[in-house]
């Protein structure tokens, strides 16, 4: 099944040693067959991160992914398959949000003007040691506390 294949190594490597934090939308596009070019690009990024071992996510990303992929995209995934994907993603570096994360996210919200949830994603990327945060929802090229935000769909060809 194509949707499970992207969880397997594909022999591609990132050019950087930086850990890469994936925002929920990138993972969703990797599984959303109706996403066209974004699906293809996200699938490639996702496979490269599996191979490199540089992928970082958070509990928030896993929660948002499960809800979106099983309820909100045009062709939803079966809940058991989505559960298996979440289980596989737990093999990545997973940042667990705690009280300190919430306070730091609020500081990011105050300083940079992002929503609380986006600020929590940025905080998780920082806490997870990521040098790059891939998201289509945040300001491409902005650097926050050493984390560079990149929109992989904004530039062609995309590179870290």
Feature annotation, model-predicted:
Residues 59-63, 83-111:
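Acidic catalytic patch
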Residues 57-59, 134:
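Short beta-strand segments at enzyme active-site cores
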Residues 1-57, 72-80, 158-159:
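Short, well-structured N-terminal submotif of metal-dependent ribonuclease cores
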Residues 1-17, 122-160:
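Acidic, PIN/NYN-like endoribonuclease modules and their adjacent C-terminal/linker elements
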């Amino acid at each position: 099944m194509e949707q499970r294949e992207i969880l397997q190594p594909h022999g591609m490597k990132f050019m950087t040693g930086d850990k890469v934090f994936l925002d929920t939308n990138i993972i969703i596009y990797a599984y959303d067959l109706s996403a066209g070019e974004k699906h293809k690009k996200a699938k490639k990024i996702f496979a490269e991160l599996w191979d490199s071992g540089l992928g970082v996510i958070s509990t928030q990303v896993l929660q948002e992914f499960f809800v979106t992929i099983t309820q909100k995209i045009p062709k939803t995934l079966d809940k058991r398959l989505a559960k298996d994907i979440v289980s596989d993603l737990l093999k990545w570096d997973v940042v667990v949000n705690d009280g300190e994360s919430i306070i730091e996210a609020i500081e990011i919200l105050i300083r940079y003007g992002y929503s609380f949830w986006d600020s929590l994603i940025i905080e998780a990327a920082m806490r997870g040691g990521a040098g790059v945060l891939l998201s289509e929802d945040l300001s491409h090229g902005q650097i926050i506390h050493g984390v560079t935000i990149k929109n992989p769909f904004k530039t062609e060809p995309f590179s870290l």
